[in-house]
């Protein structure tokens, strides 16, 4: 079954928020118009309608459209009122149905603020936490951070709806919490958690481990790219004493230090030095820890950056009810479909343009044969 057909099946389980009296348009049709128009460059409800009207004959090949193309008000109202948790569940089920994650896959968890989606009278913009499969380049799921809370409470909820068995979960220092580590282990996965000043006692104990330990495994890598040379040294300790006194971190087996030095070849910029620390339930070689930790930044470069540059997410002004969260899911469905299409060797922006121009290529992105 194609990704698009599986998407239709999953969408059929979504609760329709509308009254069943005098419905003119099918929920499935509205949702698929949203997905396809976003793939092809639409950024507003009005643009979705304009695109769908210009491609009505194309849409009729796989949609019912009993009363033609829905209006802008209808599309706005539907995406604003769909329960965002229900939509997030559908999204996660769809990803699970079209992908098989390899054992030991690194899944990065990180948050992003949708800066344009700030409602009048609200203190802050909407903040989403997403899960990114680093090797497969797929968004696995997302969850909204409650306005009166933070990522610490949202991350366990996201982990519970994902299938993370045998995966390695990487999270920045915000997620370095004992309950989060326990949730990961309870779901048969492993963790690599960044440690900073928010866990001051733990950080001090890790400093002591590297100060006094005589059994440290190291791996050094050197990369030259974009006019700079970066040297990284990954140091690993598995036989530690000081950290054990810090409390019960579930299945904690390894402490890690990454020292990086960045030198600029043709610039007056000074050399940049940084040291970062991590705890992990994994028992890997130093080289594998270095690789896993580096891959975490794929969620910044391949997801957050692409959503901003390729989809212009930060400029979105969708504020009504659940519109911002649900539109964010649309973007991630579109991103996954575009990344899943491997024949076109260009960036997301270029793929979106081609999908809008070329119906044959759009069918390829959707995995449809009509």
Positions of predicted regions on the chain:
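A C-terminal functional module that forms or caps the active site or interfaces directly
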Residues: 258-339
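Short coil/turn segments at secondary-structure boundaries
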Residues: 90-93, 106, 218-221, 303-309, ...
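Short, surface-exposed basic-aromatic patches at helix termini and helix-loop junctions that form
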Residues: 181-189
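Short hydrophobic alpha-helical runs that function as membrane-insertion/retention elements
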Residues: 190-195
């Amino acid at each position: 079954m194609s990704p698009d057909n599986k998407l239709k099946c999953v969408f059929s389980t979504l609760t329709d928020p509308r009254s069943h009296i005098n419905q003119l348009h099918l929920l499935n049709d509205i949702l698929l118009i949203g997905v396809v128009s976003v793939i092809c460059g639409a950024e507003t409800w009005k643009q979705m309608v304009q695109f769908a009207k210009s491609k009505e004959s194309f849409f009729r090949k796989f949609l019912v459209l009993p009363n033609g193309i829905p209006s802008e008000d209808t599309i706005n109202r539907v995406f604003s009122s769909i329960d965002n948790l229900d939509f997030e569940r559908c999204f996660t089920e769809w990803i699970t149905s079209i992908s098989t994650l390899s054992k030991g896959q690194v899944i990065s968890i990180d948050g992003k603020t949708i800066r344009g989606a700030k409602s009048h009278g609200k203190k802050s913009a909407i903040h989403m936490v997403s899960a990114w499969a680093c090797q497969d380049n797929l968004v696995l799921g997302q969850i909204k951070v409650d306005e009166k809370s933070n990522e610490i409470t949202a991350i366990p909820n996201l982990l519970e709806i994902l299938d993370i068995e045998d995966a390695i979960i990487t999270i920045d220092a915000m997620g370095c919490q004992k309950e989060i580590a326990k949730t990961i282990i309870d779901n048969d996965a492993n963790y690599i958690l960044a440690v900073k000043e928010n866990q001051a006692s733990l950080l001090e104990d890790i400093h002591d481990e590297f100060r006094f330990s005589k059994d440290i495994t190291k791996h050094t890598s050197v990369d030259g790219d974009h006019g700079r040379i970066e040297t990284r040294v990954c140091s690993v300790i598995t036989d530690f004493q000081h950290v054990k006194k810090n409390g019960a971190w579930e299945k904690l087996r390894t402490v890690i230090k990454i020292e990086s030095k960045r030198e600029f070849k043709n610039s007056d910029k000074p050399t940049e030095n940084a040291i970062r620390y991590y705890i992990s339930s994994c028992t890997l070689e130093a080289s594998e820890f270095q690789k896993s930790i580096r891959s975490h930044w794929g969620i910044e470069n391949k997801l957050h950056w692409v959503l901003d540059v390729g989809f212009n997410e930060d400029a979105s002004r969708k504020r009504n009810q659940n519109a911002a969260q649900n539109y964010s899911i649309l973007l991630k469905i579109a991103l996954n479909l575009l990344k899943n299409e491997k024949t076109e060797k260009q960036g997301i922006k270029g793929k979106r343009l081609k999908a809008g121009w070329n119906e044959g290529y759009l069918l390829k992105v959707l995995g449809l044969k009509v």
